[in-house]
Design a protein with these regions (language model features):
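Conserved AMP-binding/adenylate-forming core of the ANL superfamily
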Residues: 26-57, 61-70, 74, 78, ...
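Anion (oxyanion) recognition and catalysis
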Residues: 81
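Conserved ATP-dependent adenylate/AMP-binding module captured primarily in the ANL superfamily
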Residues: 92-123
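A short N-terminal helical cap/helix-turn-helix that marks the beginning
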Residues: 2-26, 44
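ANL superfamily adenylate-forming
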Residues: 31, 116-132
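Structured binding elements
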Residues: 84
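Hydrophobic residues at beta-strand termini and immediately following loops
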Residues: 37, 90, 130
Length: 132
């Protein structure tokens, strides 16, 4: 693989995906008992999410990702970029004022959260006030 001929992380990922056995493990949870995802599973999930994201954004729109370190984070990150969006990942440990600043500064077209606990951290912030 000639990395210097690739233009993005998305191209690098899909090139690597084409080169490896699709059944080879790729992502797994740190918690016991959670599933492991192979290269084929991840590729399919990226394409499905990317297709949905493409219906919600225009090329170059920012897409915020609020998630813990988990397999779905990488899937969301690559899906956003594959859809033409700009991925804006944020930590789950920020203070409310940090979330408020980032939301207003980046003005995301969509926000992807990993679970309801993460959504609760931001859904009450002024950014979501449709009357302003």
């Amino acid at each position: 693989m000639e990395i210097n001929k690739l233009n993005s992380l998305v191209e690098l990922y899909f090139k690597k995906c084409d080169e490896v056995d699709k059944k080879k493990p790729f992502l797994e949870w740190l918690k016991p008992g959670k599933p492991t995802y192979n290269w084929g599973d991840v590729r399919e999930r990226i394409f499905k999410l990317s297709s949905k994201i493409k219906t919600l954004i225009n090329e170059g729109d920012r897409c915020l990702i609020l998630s813990e370190n988990r397999p779905y984070w990488l899937i969301a990150d690559i899906a956003v970029m594959n859809a033409g969006g700009i991925s804006v990942p944020i930590f789950t440990t920020y203070a409310e004022s940090d979330y408020n600043y980032i939301l207003n500064d980046c003005d995301p077209e969509i926000i992807i959260v990993s679970n309801n606990d993460q959504f609760k951290k931001i859904n009450h912030l002024p950014f979501f006030d449709v009357t302003s």
